[in-house]
Amino acid sequence: MSTRLATLRAALAVTATLLPTAAWAHVGHGSTVGFVHGFVHPVTGIDHVLAMVAVGLFAANLGGRALWAVPLSFVSVMAVGGVLGVAGIGVPFVEAGIAISVIVLGLAVALRWQWPVAAAMALVGIFAIFHGHAHGAEMPVDASGLEYGLGFMLATALLHVVGIGLGIGIARFGRTTSPRVIQFGGGAMAVAGLGILTGVI
């Protein structure tokens, strides 16, 4: 357990180093608007929230280096997708890709996939393009692009941390029941993703 806690601390340290503090939001009006809108965008969409938390749960299930490498892969590739969105460079099937990400990542949690870290990083990276593009394409015209991007990157990283915290926290309650709770949650995410894909949600 001490090893897991040490790895989690390392993941938090990487997040703190990579992403900005709220001070970035006070450079000017455009910066404030950009950072706030960027931060709010991921947390106000159920599809984004479910996928981000699922990434954290997936990483927690894999453990070890995956605790920081998998979320870092998502945030990094998402930034590329965000640039594409801001630049108006099209990515096909963005909305479908986001919904499918909720389904697949939910299944990864529900079925407790034990993938190599590199494969898990590649999987989440594919889906990160869609999420990042959606964020970038919806940037307000009066927002600062840099601060907007930093805002949604920070919010995404925090949602990953929530997922990691849930995964590790629930695992402490018992080896028999805790995996089932996490698997049930993953299954619920996958079902929700199917609802998003079909337009029911």
Segments (PLM) and residue ranges:
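Membrane metalloprotein/metal-transporter helix-bundle signature
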Residues: 2-201
